[in-house]
Amino acid sequence: MLRRLTANIFDFLLVLIIIFSIISIIPQSKNAENISKELNTYIEKNLFTLKGEERNQAIDLAYSLDRETTYLYVVAALVMIVYFIFIPKYLKGKTLGKYFRKIKLVNEDISEVNYNTLTYRALLNTGLFIIILLPFFVYICNAFWYFNITLILMALQLLFWLISAIILIIKKKSLVDYLTKTKIIEVKR
């Protein structure tokens, strides 16, 4: 279980580094920069203590910034798809974290996982589902609904991770393993 945990931490940190590295070289529009600066004034006040009109203005600014920078969701989604779907398929069930920890993902019958299984796992386990959905919601919802949908989706993802961690501790197999009929095994070199 420790190998799996350290592999997952390594993978998520690496993906975050890749995403932020790519995003940092993409120039922001002037409008996005202005919105970001204005939003930072609210963040400095602590978003969770804002009330009334100030809170609504902060939500509107965050919504406007997300509309202005939806390309960032595309970058994040593409990196996650490559890292959590294509790389494990190419490396026969291993991400870089799993490779270094000498473990790999297989179907319950020990056969190699396919793209459908890897996609399903990535959508459930990495937040990819949310990253794909939010750019659509930002254009079909107003700021209020977008903010609430975002919070609900994030809470559901956190709940999924919590339930999965509890099941993993008790049963030595995570919720996503049960849902995708997969397991993690040690690799002998």
Q: What residue ranges belong to the model's regions?
A:
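Short, small/hydrophobic-residue-rich motifs at membrane-helix boundaries and re-entrant hairpins
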Residues: 1-136, 140, 150-189
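Membrane-helix boundary connector in multi-pass membrane proteins
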Residues: 142-146
